[in-house]
């Protein structure tokens, strides 16, 4: 078996020319209590913890060779057990995705799946017990290495543990779909493999891994390996026994799979195949036939690797992990000015959320102002209440809570609050005259070096700054709601914004842990412009006569986080109307103002739906307001029209240099609108579906980018 596996991996290694190779170093230890000699395999790519350990073919070959060694030692009675652990802070984080996206043939993809299985399953076939010590971050194939071992321990300090493959467009393909449900039951496995993945790749902490039954013991991070080896000795001597509950293979298993399908349907609406392939394997894993399950994982892995959703997923992953850290067009960071105090104009909900964010991330004095004391007190009170919540959840200690509360204050007099502020952001009513007045008042009292930022969602930065003595220090700083969750920050350069203001804005964004994208001062910037064109076409077809349900269902195959009209409700119909009016003034040939939306806003409705049954149903009062024509389109016709409009708008935005490249459009939609990885944002999907060429005459991305190489 070993020779066959070695040959398989040697052939596959040629497909991964740039693999960062992980070593599998074997050392021998004398276990405590005279338990015997023990072989410990450490997975290490030779780099620090910022470069996590991964598995490509050469890395798997190294692990295979290490298993050859310990297999021989076990057979000869030289060792009593084998352990696997990782380098400091990292256990292993799965397959080498850089190599995966280079694969061009189904048989090559199949070989990668088989190679991992052939190596990992040898751990469970050794003549001595095997142990996995999850000392640090473990994801994907890293988790699966441990699942093939007989016993597992986990560190309380472990920051991230997941099987994230479905999130990317794959299945856990080296044992996860088969071994995990057979270890902890189908329902818990569905939570880890499906629910967590589709919930923005939710990670587990060490304690949760233990409580789920994935790990058999939980130890402190400071002496994790030492305690794990003591526990190992106790297991081998029979002083400690691991008792695992029986797995329910009856109706509960089928119910768990059905729950997983419900979750997948609600998240991706059948648009991405990965979750459904994983659920099929989990369903069949009920039989306990491990090899049949491994074979199914191999096939699913190969099929998905050769599909567009995975390529888009890897592209999206790279945007979020790499491009987001090196924003296109950002000026020299050395030009940034220090920020030691922040001012916030306004004390409403958005302003209060911003104050809390600046306070938590920068830990500098933050002062709010508003038009009356009651509003100021309410804003400061909101921040204090949120700090108390963090304290209650154990996220901060009492000393830090007291310190943060002491750093936030509120005043009515801008001169008193802002005379020594370095960065002042306004979050007042979305009306150009109001914002111009606010900036005029702030400029009169703020120090000369202070940056003036606006959280406007659609108004012109240049116009806002046009009446100031120093418009060069005004910058757009557009957050997305909810501020604490959505990572995008559109940094908008006005016509006169200078590099120092821009560099300071990018520096602050980094400290806020936001994904900053440089945007030209164009109406509605990026996300709101695309979403308004998208939702505007939905509203247009409804106005023309297509039933609301048909229009909504037409875009379900995209697998968006929510339907257009549910999103409108979240944003607020009044805000949606305001943005559409702004864009209509700028581009009347493409952006309309829906009379039905205007009627909904005038009637004071919060949206198109009521939720009496728990599900969205068209509000009868809204239905009575709708005035529709007699043009009824099919779902396919609606979908084509909407996607063509989006593609046309993106092409125009790129021609106008609103952002540097299509990649920035995609990064904005992923991080600002929550559009899914399987779309790659949107341009990979538009290319894959032929929409780009149909609507604009050419692709957005080069062939092979976010797609299978030719």
Protein language model features and the residues they cover:
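A short, well-ordered alpha-helical element
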Residues: 55-79
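Short, active-site-adjacent cap segments at secondary-structure transitions
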Residues: 89-93, 139-140, 459-460
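STAS-typified acidic loop motif
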Residues: 34-61, 88
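Gly/Ser-rich catalytic serine loop of serine hydrolases
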Residues: 132-142
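Amphipathic alpha-helical interaction surfaces in cytosolic regulatory modules
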Residues: 63, 75, 88-102, 108, ...
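Conserved catalytic cysteine-centered active-site region
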Residues: 120-132
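N-terminal glycine-rich phosphate-binding loop for ADP-containing cofactors
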Residues: 2-36, 44, 66, 70, ...
